[in-house]
């Protein structure tokens, strides 16, 4: 069973994750993980925190000589900003709990419901954990899963489809090589240069007015074998699990797979993908409006997922709120934040998709070592070609 937990606060000493169930013999390097962490910190519209942090992973267990051992993997990412908060966020009784107290919840954040649920008079106890800073740990964990996918010839790419009112035009038949090249050269991870220019202007305008912007990103996965997931129970449907993982990313408010919500607006004849057969190829679809999943099971076509991110709740022109201490109306508190973090969310989206696919692969093929799962996947693919 492949699973993980993360721990840590935004201004605590570090973020930590423990991964259990990863196969032995998987090559994993600091450089690979750090590259993905750097991507998460990039993107136009980020805030001042990114000038402080330079995320780097440290492996504390489970990896030796650049390869996983099969033991639980402990990884840690230090928070460089900790030195500015060590007295306030200290775990001991000497913590300066009366400093930087937050009592004015931000609309759209976990602040108020979290403070009520956990009976906190200082909202900092909520916002420190609910912060998207936690996603750095999930990117590190998901990057390990991505290493496994790449060893199995499964490749994925994410890109930004829209920011605010600006939508990119991205052809469905673009190769993964073209998509990767275009997104890598874009400061917004957007493969449409003209749309990117307009997005930058809209972000600048939002910054000038103290506002924030959301958007949509897409993740495509190529080389996914037939048969991951299952139709037999709701919680084994792969589309359900992928959507849940995407919705678990901070600020994500909607997820669609394939044609998604667009399928509700057209007749079935324009939704469902017709099935064909060729001796050298086997069964295949003439289109991919299902996004690579039918009945909760992968069908061999590329996976296509999109997620909608709401604008960040922290506004430099804050909205009206109420102080939880004196119940008087105030403007919401302001924490250091981004204007737009859709590109960063895209990187997190890649990571959580990679993780869920790794879990599904382990469930389907099992194995304790990389060689074992490779052999079982190869055997399965040979059988599928004969069906």
Swiss-Prot record:
Lineage top rank: taxon: Bacteria
Residues binding NADP(+), per UniProt: 40, 46
Pfam families for the chain: Chorismate_synt
Similarity-based family: Belongs to the chorismate synthase family.
Record key words, sorted: Amino-acid biosynthesis, Aromatic amino acid biosynthesis, FAD, Flavoprotein, FMN, Lyase, NADP
Name of the molecule in the record: Chorismate synthase
Single GO biological process annotation from the record: aromatic amino acid family biosynthetic process
PROSITE patterns cross-referenced by the UniProt entry: CHORISMATE_SYNTHASE_1 (PS00787), CHORISMATE_SYNTHASE_2 (PS00788), CHORISMATE_SYNTHASE_3 (PS00789)
Organism: Desulforamulus reducens (strain ATCC BAA-1160 / DSM 100696 / MI-1) (Desulfotomaculum reducens)
GO molecular function: chorismate synthase activity; FMN binding
Catalysed reactions, semicolon-separated: 5-O-(1-carboxyvinyl)-3-phosphoshikimate = chorismate + phosphate
Metabolic or biological pathway: Metabolic intermediate biosynthesis; chorismate biosynthesis; chorismate from D-erythrose 4-phosphate and phosphoenolpyruvate: step 7/7
Cofactor: FMNH2
Stated role: This reaction introduces a second double bond into the aromatic ring system.
Entry's Gene Ontology cellular component terms: cytosol
EC number, as in UniProt: 4.2.3.5
Cofactor note: Reduced FMN (FMNH(2)).
């Amino acid at each position: 069973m492949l699973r993980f937990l993360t721990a840590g606060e935004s201004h605590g000493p570090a973020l930590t994750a423990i991964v259990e169930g990863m196969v032995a013999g998987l090559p994993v390097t600091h450089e690979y993980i750090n590259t993905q962490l750097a991507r998460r910190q990039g993107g136009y519209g980020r805030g001042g925190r990114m000038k402080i942090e330079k995320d780097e992973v440290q492996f504390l267990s489970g990896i030796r000589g650049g390869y996983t051992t099969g033991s639980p993997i402990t990884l840690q990412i230090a928070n460089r900003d900790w030195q500015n908060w060590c007295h306030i966020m200290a775990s001991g009784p000497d913590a300066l709990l009366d400093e930087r107290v937050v009592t004015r919840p931000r609309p759209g954040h976990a602040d108020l419901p979290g403070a009520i649920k956990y009976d906190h008079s200082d909202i900092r106890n909520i916002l420190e954990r609910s912060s998207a800073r936690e996603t750095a740990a999930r990117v590190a964990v998901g990057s390990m899963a991505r290493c496994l996918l790449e060893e199995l010839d499964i490749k994925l790419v994410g890109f930004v489809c829209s920011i605010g009112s600006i939508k990119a035009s991205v052809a469905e038949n673009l190769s993964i090589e073209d998509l990767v090249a275009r997104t890598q050269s874009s400061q917004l991870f957007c493969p449409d240069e003209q749309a990117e220019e307009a997005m930058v202007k809209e972000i600048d305008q939002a910054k000038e007015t103290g506002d924030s912007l959301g958007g949509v990103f897409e993740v495509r996965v190529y080389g996914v074998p037939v048969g991951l997931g299952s139709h037999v129970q709701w919680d084994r449907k792969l589309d359900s699990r992928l959507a849940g993982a995407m919705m678990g990313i901070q600020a994500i408010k909607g997820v669609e797979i394939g044609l998604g919500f667009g399928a509700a607006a057209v007749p079935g004849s324009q939704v469902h993908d017709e099935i064909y057969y060729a001796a050298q190829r086997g069964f295949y679809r003439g289109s991919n409006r299902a996004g690579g999943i039918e009945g909760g099971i992968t069908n061999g076509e590329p996976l296509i997922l999109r997620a909608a991110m709401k604008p960040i709740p922290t506004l430099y022109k804050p909205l009206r709120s109420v102080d939880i201490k004196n119940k008087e109306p105030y403007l919401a508190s302001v924490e250091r934040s981004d204007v737009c973090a859709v590109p960063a969310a895209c990187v997190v989206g890649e990571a959580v998709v990679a993780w869920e696919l790794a879990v599904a692969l382990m469930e389907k093929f099992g194995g304790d070592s990389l060689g074992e799962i490779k052999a079982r996947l190869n055997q399965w693919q040979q059988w599928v070609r004969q069906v």
